[in-house]
């Protein structure tokens, strides 16, 4: 739990530093320097680049969480299935549950790419960047946590095969927070 909390704090700090650095870049320079730089060459930082970085981070972070969750579920499933191969179907469902966060992160990334206006400015890019972060960060953490819940449910199913439905329910409860983050990101993008 402490490792996940530390990871969340580090990710939040990175997102905050990234966002503030772009805000400072867009607003904090002296007017003469900005006018002089604009006359010489265009800024390498555009709204499109910022939005696309947010989309990429969302898909990457949620994908990492899902990959890790499915991986630890797979390791536990392999151990249980080696002793009781008849449980493979039930174990596969439990192992696959943490994979949904990666799908949600990909969905938000595609939504950012489709909804970002052509020629959007830095402020619009930051808005889309920030809008993609709830799903990216929560997808990472909830994918890992759902994988841990799936491991416990897999072990429970190995000992009591009739309890797999209860294990699915317990594992699916973690999904609630990924769905809330998905909704938050979608609302921040479209509104």
Residues of each region from the PLM?
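Hydrophobic, small-residue-rich transmembrane alpha-helices and their short perimembrane loops
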Residues: 3-15, 19-191
């Amino acid at each position: 739990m402490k490792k996940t909390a530390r990871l969340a704090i580090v990710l939040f700090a990175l997102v905050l530093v990234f966002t503030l650095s772009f805000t400072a870049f867009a607003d904090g320079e002296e007017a003469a320097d900005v006018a002089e730089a604009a006359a010489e060459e265009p800024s390498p930082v555009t709204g499109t680049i910022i939005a696309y970085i947010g989309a990429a981070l969302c898909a990457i972070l949620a994908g990492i969480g899902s990959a890790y969750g499915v991986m630890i579920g797979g390791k536990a499933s392999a151990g249980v299935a080696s002793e009781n191969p008849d449980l493979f179907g039930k174990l596969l469902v439990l192992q696959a549950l943490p994979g949904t966060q990666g799908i949600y992160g990909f969905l938000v990334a595609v939504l950012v790419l489709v909804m970002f206006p052509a020629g959007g400015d830095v402020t619009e890019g930051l808005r889309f960047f920030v809008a993609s972060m709830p799903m990216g960060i929560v997808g990472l953490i909830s994918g890992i946590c759902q994988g841990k819940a799936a491991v416990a449910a897999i072990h429970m199913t190995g000992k009591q095969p009739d309890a797999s439905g209860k294990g699915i329910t317990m594992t699916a409860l973690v999904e609630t927070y990924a769905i809330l983050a998905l909704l938050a990101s979608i609302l921040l993008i479209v509104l």
